């Protein structure tokens, strides 16, 4: 069992990708303090805060299978952390996945509680998105 979360701010680690490049500023996901919506359920925890901007708002992805903890960003720009009863993606990009170590915390988060996401490892960057790593 996971210990009850007493803090008002819950910290969650996120593995970047696979489609974080579909956001204008993927790091905005981890630079925003989100609030858990009262519209959350076993399908997903909806986050409220400053909407993320899609890089290609007119493009759609085919539906894809995902795992519990995947973070998809629908057209309104407000992330949804998918829960145990999640469907396929519904054409929305998955920009990260909550780490295995933190996934059980998601079920403990109450509506109105604040959530801060952190990259669990550095993001891969596309050319033109800042520093790239040479191999």
List PLM regions with ranges.
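Conserved "landmark" site that anchors the functional core of diverse proteins
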Residues: 1-135
């Amino acid at each position: 069992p996971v210990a009850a979360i007493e803090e008002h701010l819950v910290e969650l680690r996120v593995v970047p990708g696979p489609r974080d490049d579909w956001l204008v500023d993927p790091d905005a996901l981890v630079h925003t303090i989100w609030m858990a919506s009262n519209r959350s359920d076993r399908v997903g925890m909806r986050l409220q805060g400053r909407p993320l901007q899609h890089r290609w708002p007119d493009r759609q992805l085919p539906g894809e299978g995902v795992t519990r903890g995947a973070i998809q960003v629908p057209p309104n720009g407000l992330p949804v952390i998918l829960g145990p009863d999640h469907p396929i993606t519904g054409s929305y990009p998955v920009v990260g996945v909550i780490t295995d170590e933190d996934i059980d915390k998601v079920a403990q988060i109450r509506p109105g509680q604040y959530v801060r996401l952190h990259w669990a490892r550095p993001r891969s960057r596309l050319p033109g998105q800042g520093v790239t790593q040479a191999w």
